[in-house]
């Protein structure tokens, strides 16, 4: 009886018929759905039929059954296709899919017709996943080909560093067919032996190695701490207001969050208007029916609040601002567009019309302009040149975690610091967290080991940092400027939200002379070079919706980097990623329930993710309205260094693998600015200034830690 009441409560008085109630209850049992979830599916079904309300008739319920069946078959096919790798040397016969449906996400073909990249040796694309999609999970080309998937054994995924040609430099000539013997079915968890024995200091990949020599480093390193250098070679200056990051988390105001999201759309409306020389009258509300073409600016959102991760061009809507459309949403018709790359939260500008009141038909997409590049005066550049005495600048970048999953040994970090002091000798060392990872298996389980080297055992995770990390970090030469940037997974941070306040140097008992704690994200200046750093995995979290052969054939990391630059935010995705797991139940409190009830009682707990504080997302935008010279965004994906729109984009990779094997770090060499060598671009104006053109002067080496 209670089930009947739930059905009527959700579906309304039209469901108060015995045959309707019976049919809907049977569907809840058949698909293991609650009445509320079934009603949400019914709304999706109605929306797909372009109806705000669908009558509860026997005919419509039969069609609804087919809708649910198609969704179930789609997910089953995707799961099965992602868990198998074809090891046959014979190219399989590929049959055309005949049952493609325009329902939400079901129009994505499942035929893997794109060629796979050839790998000359095992390497890691992700530290946490064994399957990596080149492009988004819904990436397709204009002929409907599904995205390329590469699968590796768990050992490869954790321990590979990449001694062969990295994916960032793979060429089309290296492609292999799906039957290539390069790809083996995962059968073992044993890491590849050659990957375990990568020597420390081996260069895994390089950007621009032909034109620039590796910097000899900082000549002051090696001097006694009491000896002062004859001159200060580098200046590290923050380029943001640190006080703005000192907000209190978990106090989000819905009105403030709404204002921030609305301001993002309005600010880009002005940028589009100025860039394309449009008048305010050219912009109109895309949700209102009109036969005239208009310009519209808004945010890409899913067409259903219960969307899954498999989006496609047919399941997107445009969210307007209060001024542009009272915050309403309208579904998008992208059939007239040949090339596109969208993701959730992206601010876009369209030209089109809403002829029927249901869809906004996009006729053309207006590319967002890229931000300007930073400049310096000739006097400033000559000063930095004099400080370096004409030598190159050397910067080292590392990213945590810094110990393996089964222990707290920092032996690898100690070896690295010794190498930094005695051999590498950089001017600046940038270290990203997590330092003490709150998701570390031993910390998450509360099973901290005994530390025989300590007289007293650490009682808190803060004490654990002071006893493990602080003594090692203090051994860094005082002539090396060290920058610490936290992670939202850092146990030593009191600010576990993004944007994130900096660590407290005094609490970490680190010397003031050469240690600087920066926020996450942060922009800072090293001499004339502007660095933009963010410690949230944008490259992994950004899932694109792709259409068009030209777009899908481009390297995915280049596309994601361009999105970041165009959106002018280090994390342009909204909503942010969330990683959860099923919370284990206490055996003593388990109840005797049937299978259905036990499924409904699963409790999910939050592990990590972007953890966005929406009210303060303005702090994640590029400071000053210009792009950085060097943008560093660590990711769990394969390390890489690229030049995208004259910006050097770097992912240094993980410092250590989960199994304890060596990871990677980045070494940046930037030639000293020289007004005479032609690598700086003069910009005429009231006061002549020069573009830094760091991408012409920089070399990046990705090195085994």
Swiss-Prot record:
PTM-bearing positions, type Phosphoserine: 126
Molecular function terms from GO: DNA binding
Comp. bias regions, Polar residues: 125-134
Keywords, in A-Z order: DNA replication, Nucleus, Phosphoprotein
Note: Present with 11200 molecules/cell in log phase SD medium.
ATP-binding found in the keyword field: no
Domain of life of the organism encoding this protein: Eukaryota
Protein known as: DNA polymerase alpha subunit B
Species of provenance: Saccharomyces cerevisiae (strain ATCC 204508 / S288c) (Baker's yeast)
PTM statement from Swiss-Prot or TrEMBL: Phosphorylated in a cell cycle-dependent manner.
Entries under InterPro entries matching the protein: DNA_pol_a/d/e_bsu (IPR007185), DNA_pol_alpha_bsu (IPR016722), DPOA2_OB (IPR054300)
Chief location of this protein within or outside the cell: nucleus
GO-annotated cellular components: alpha DNA polymerase:primase complex; nuclear envelope; nucleus
Entry's Gene Ontology BP terms: DNA biosynthetic process; DNA replication initiation; telomere capping
Family: Belongs to the DNA polymerase alpha subunit B family.
Region spans: Disordered: 115-199
Family annotation (Pfam families): DNA_pol_E_B (PF04042), DPOA2_OB (PF22062)
Signal sequence residues: none
């Amino acid at each position: 009886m209670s089930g009947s009441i739930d059905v009527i409560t959700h579906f309304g008085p039209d469901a108060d018929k015995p045959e309707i109630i019976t049919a809907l209850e049977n569907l809840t049992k058949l698909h293991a759905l609650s009445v509320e979830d079934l009603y949400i599916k019914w709304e999706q079904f109605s929306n797909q039929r372009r109806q705000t309300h669908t009558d509860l008739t026997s005919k419509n319920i039969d069609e609804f059954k087919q809708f649910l069946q198609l969704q179930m078959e789609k997910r089953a096919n995707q799961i099965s296709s992602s868990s198998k790798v074809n090891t046959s040397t014979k190219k399989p016969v590929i049959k055309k899919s005949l049952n493609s449906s325009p329902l939400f996400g079901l129009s994505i073909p499942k035929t893997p017709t794109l060629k796979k990249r050839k790998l000359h040796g095992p390497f890691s694309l992700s530290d946490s996943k064994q399957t990596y999609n080149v492009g988004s999970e819904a990436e397709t080309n204009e002929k409907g080909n599904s995205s390329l998937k590469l699968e590796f054994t768990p050992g490869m995924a954790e321990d590979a560093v990449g001694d062969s040609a990295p994916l960032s430099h793979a060429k089309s000539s290296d492609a292999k067919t799906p039957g290539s013997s390069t790809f083996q079915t995962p059968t073992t968890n044993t890491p590849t032996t050659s990957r375990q024995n990568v020597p420390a200091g081996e260069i895994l990949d390089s950007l621009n190695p032909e034109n620039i020599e590796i910097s000899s480093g900082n000549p002051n390193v090696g001097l006694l701490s009491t000896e002062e250098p004859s001159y200060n070679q580098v200046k590290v200056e923050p380029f943001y207001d640190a006080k703005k990051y000192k907000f209190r988390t978990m106090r989000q105001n819905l009105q403030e969050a709404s204002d921030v999201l609305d301001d993002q759309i309005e600010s880009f409306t002005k940028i589009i208007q100025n860039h394309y020389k449009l008048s305010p009258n050219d912009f109109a509300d895309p949700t209102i029916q009109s036969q005239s073409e208009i310009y519209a600016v808004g945010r890409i959102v899913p067409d259903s609040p219960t969307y899954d991760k498999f989006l496609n061009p047919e399941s997107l809507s445009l969210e307007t601002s209060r001024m542009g459309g009272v915050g309403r949403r309208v579904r998008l018709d992208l059939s007239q567009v040949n090339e596109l790359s969208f993701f959730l939260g992206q601010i876009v500008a369209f030209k089109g019309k809403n002829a029927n009141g249901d869809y906004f038909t996009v006729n053309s997409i207006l590319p967002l302009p890229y931000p300007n590049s930073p400049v310096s005066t000739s006097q400033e550049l000559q000063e930095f040149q004099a400080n370096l005495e004409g030598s190159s600048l050397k910067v080292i970048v590392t990213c945590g975690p810094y110990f393996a999953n089964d222990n707290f040994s920092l032996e690898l970090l100690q070896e690295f610091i010794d190498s930094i002091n005695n051999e590498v000798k950089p001017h600046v060392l940038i270290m990203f967290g997590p330092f003490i990872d709150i998701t570390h298996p031993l910390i998450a389980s509360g099973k901290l080991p005994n530390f025989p080297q300590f007289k007293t055992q650490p009682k808190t995770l803060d004490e654990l940092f002071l006893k493990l990390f602080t003594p090692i970090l203090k051994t860094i030469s005082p002539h090396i400027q060290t920058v610490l940037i936290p992670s939202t997974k850092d146990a030593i941070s009191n600010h576990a939200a993004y944007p994130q306040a900096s660590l407290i140097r005094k609490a970490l008992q680190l010397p003031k002379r050469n240690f600087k704690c920066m926020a996450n994200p942060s922009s800072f200046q090293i001499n004339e070079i502007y660095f933009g750093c963010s410690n949230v995995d944008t490259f992994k979290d950004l899932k694109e919706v792709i259409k068009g052969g030209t777009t899908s054939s481009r390297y995915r990391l280049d596309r994601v980097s361009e999105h970041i630059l165009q959106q002018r935010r280090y994390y342009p995705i909204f909503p942010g990623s969330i990683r959860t797991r099923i919370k284990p139940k206490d055996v003593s409190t388990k109840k005797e329930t049937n299978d259905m009830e036990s499924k409904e009682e699963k409790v999910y707990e939050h592990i990590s993710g972007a953890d966005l504080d929406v009210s303060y997302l303005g702090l994640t935008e590029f400071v000053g309205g210009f792009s950085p010279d060097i943008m560093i965004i660590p990711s769990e994906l394969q390390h890489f260094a690229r030049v995208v729109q004259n910006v050097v984009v770097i992912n240094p990779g993980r410092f250590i693998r989960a199994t304890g094997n060596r990871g990677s770090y980045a070494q940046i060499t930037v030639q000293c600015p020289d007004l005479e060598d032609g690598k700086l671009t003069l910009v005429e104006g009231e006061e002549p200034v020069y573009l830094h053109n760091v991408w012409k002067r920089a070399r990046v080496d990705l090195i085994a830690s």
